[in-house]
Amino acid sequence: MSGKKAAARLMIQGTSSNVGKSVLAAAFCRIFYQEGYHVAPFKAQNMALNSFITRSGGEMGRAQVVQAQAAGLEPDVRMNPVLLKPTGHTGSQVIVLGKAQGTLSALKYHGDYQRKTWPIVEEALHELLEEHEIVVIEGAGSPAEVNLKQNDIVNMRVAKEAQAPVLLVADIDRGGALASVVGTLELLEPEERQLVQGIVMNKFRGDIKLLQPALDFLEERTGIPVVGVVPFYDQFKIPEEDSVVLEEQNTSKRDQGKSRDEALDVAVIRLPYLSNFTDFDPFEDEPDVILRYVREPSELGEPDCVIIPGSKNTLSDLRFLWESGLGEKIIKFWQEDVPIIGICGGYQMLGRIVRDPLGTESDLKEIAGLGILPMETEFELDKHTVQSRGKVVGGELFLARCQGTEITGYEIHMGRSQGEGHSLFEIEAQETAYGDGMSAGSAVGTYLHGIFDNDPLRTALLEWLWERRGGTRPVGETMSQAAIREQSFNELADWVRNSMDMEKIRAMMGLHKG
């Protein structure tokens, strides 16, 4: 033993999915970071279509990337050693320590394979505990799923291994929060229940005085203190974990009330297997943009720009475009000179054909693309995952405004595309230089996720779209994405800190009062 003081731990578990665990974990990461601690996030297993590529080329869940940024750290795949990316209703691609291991059915994964990943999870957890002063751990779903408990590697088994005090979070905005807390605790084993040292009511609306009798009841019934009631607030500009947030509405709350006269209309196709929709978060931060997600042709209207996003199942989503009529509508828009942008899987769909002879994504062997870009794509077994850096070299459309501009992004794809056009970007990644992207008429495609996080490129696009309307952009210079992110982390930390009994939380963690 090195004699080094053991890291303090705190684990956030929930009564169900989507109660706010990821955001609260990010808040605690920033709170402790502000207090001068060296803090790291950890989630043993995540299931999400939003992923990120680390500097070393490893793939991990976006939520832990956000938490790492809140903690002032470079993302590390050990923070999310197991990532499941759904490829269909019953199967997922399994990614372990950043590398794809293949696609398994839910039944096969929750059997032997999940048990085999526990030593990897265990090692990653203990390494982070050795290297940091505090580790903020996030659970998944609910710890009371009795049908999954036998092979659990993400909830109470992690809490026991880390000897971490657990905060149990309920979403009171949904209703039934008291029953969900009591029911969850009733279904836990006695030794698991002892680990739960605090209850948090999240997303509360109204006067807390009216809630106090319920809080008193919870404490008396469970013997566990309520350590926080976090008021509802949905304006934090923190990237969301998964596309469940898109199910509630097709237009961002930040965009409601904007008229088409004062804002550009950007329509993103809501693919069934849409991935990395955080690519479009920068548009939500622009005061002159309305960002919409559309599922069918009738919802498209007359957008200033149509974006086909990334996909975890490109061939199936391409089939969806054809069967829904969206494919024909997009082609018609392109013929009418409406700007069309494809990102990763969306880029592949813009080509002439997509082939998957080895069945890497689905049972479909090939399907006709939209035929807008002069290229063809074929899927291979090897997954290309890199952080990319480069510059704009293609002079088409809005890119003519930012020639030579340096850009960053990341790539996650198994398809290789070949075509006749000139590259739009000159990329350097892992000591290799290559071209990326293609354009034809009003259409542009690229493999780069995160492309719109590049402030000069995004600004060039928006100015170009306004000029196409016959006007000039009505807003001046806006905050950079980096500045917006930092401001949001600090606001989130203040919001949560002021809603929590931080003295009790520090005490359960073994920390002195900050």
UniProtKB/Swiss-Prot annotation:
Catalyzes amidations at positions B, D, E, and G on adenosylcobyrinic A,C-diamide. NH(2) groups are provided by glutamine, and one molecule of ATP is hydrogenolyzed for each amidation. InterPro entries: Class_I_gatase-like, CobQ/CobB/MinD/ParA_Nub-bd_dom, CobQ_GATase1, CobQ_N, CobQ_synth, GATase_3, P-loop_NTPase. One of its GO terms (molecular function) is ABC-type vitamin B12 transporter activity. The gene is cobQ. Pfam families: CbiA, GATase_3. CDD domains: CobQ_N, GATase1_CobQ. One of its GO terms (biological process) is cobalamin biosynthetic process. NCBIfam families: cobQ (TIGR00313), PRK00784.1 (NF001989). The active site is at 344 (nucleophile), 449. Residues 263-457 form the GATase cobBQ-type domain. Pathway: Cofactor biosynthesis; adenosylcobalamin biosynthesis. Keywords: Cobalamin biosynthesis, Glutamine amidotransferase. Belongs to the CobB/CobQ family. CobQ subfamily. This is Cobyric acid synthase. The keyword ATP-binding does not apply.
